[in-house]
Amino acid sequence: MDAYLHCLSHTPLVGFVDPEQAVLDEVNGVIADARRRISAFEPELVVLFAPDHYNGFFYDVMPPFCLGVGATAIGDFASAAGDLPVPTELAEACAHAVINSGIDLAVSYNMQVDHGFAQPLEFLLGGLDRVPVLPVFINGVAAPLPGFQRTRLLGEAMGRFLNTLNKRVLILGSGGLSHQPPVPELAKADAHLRDRLLGSGKQLPPDERERRQQRVINAARRFTEDQRSLHPLNPVWDNRFMSLLEQGRLAELDAIGNDELSAMAGKSTHEIKTWVAAFAALSAFGCWRSEGRYYRPIPEWIAGFGSLSATTEI
């Protein structure tokens, strides 16, 4: 059957710190166009590769990859909240297939996800519950991180399974591009923050969650005024990365180490591995072509903001 792919940057800062109206209208138009293409495709199943920001995954157990057999979005930063419609038996079959292919994919029957998962479902499909979804977490912030090669192999294994289903599959990648918002690091954490990163942060008191979110908002405002206050965005790298994906040259990314990527584009740029997994999964369906490429650095969102679609060819 056919597959359709869309990769999209996410940002929790939408509605909190926005760019000028002309830029906002431009981005909203890009998302609306992608949503129309997806609607015309009429997906029967969504596979969503996305990261977490210490809202569902912590250092008590931090897998490189995890498939949610059950998943709930927490609604951080006013994003959509609620259960994701995961088809249990299909998710279990997917996990077995990927593991049998040699990829050590963890599973969770109670996966907690944040805006990284919720935002693409909300923006591109109109809500969390529109289409059955297989949510796949890819660790993008908590060292040690998976590399490009292993992430690509995960995507290929997922794609081989998806191609056996006789369904119209929408493959989504969520995150990136270049950016480094104020995400905590275990090596630099004080005792309280360390406790949160080891797992107690999964159920934050409302006032603490509000303070945490306000820190990100304040950082975005500072970055808008002074782009030396955080790691700078890297449009050159972002566009090179998107071109490699469009040309199907995923394996060329394998040689880029995690430290090198962080230095080039920021420590949260590792979220782009969700895009790599998505394109690798699409490759299992045969020939494809890209469409709808968009890119703009948006300091207000602390992100090189990208959007890219691809469709299989008969």
Swiss-Prot record:
Its EC number is 1.13.11.16. Pathway: Aromatic compound metabolism; 3-phenylpropanoate degradation. Its cofactor is Fe(2+). It catalyses: 3-(2,3-dihydroxyphenyl)propanoate + O2 = (2Z,4E)-2-hydroxy-6-oxonona-2,4-dienedioate + H(+); (2E)-3-(2,3-dihydroxyphenyl)prop-2-enoate + O2 = (2Z,4E,7E)-2-hydroxy-6-oxonona-2,4,7-trienedioate + H(+). Homotetramer. NCBIfam families: PRK13370.1-1, PRK13370.1-4. This is 2,3-dihydroxyphenylpropionate/2,3-dihydroxicinnamic acid 1,2-dioxygenase. It comes from Klebsiella pneumoniae (strain 342).
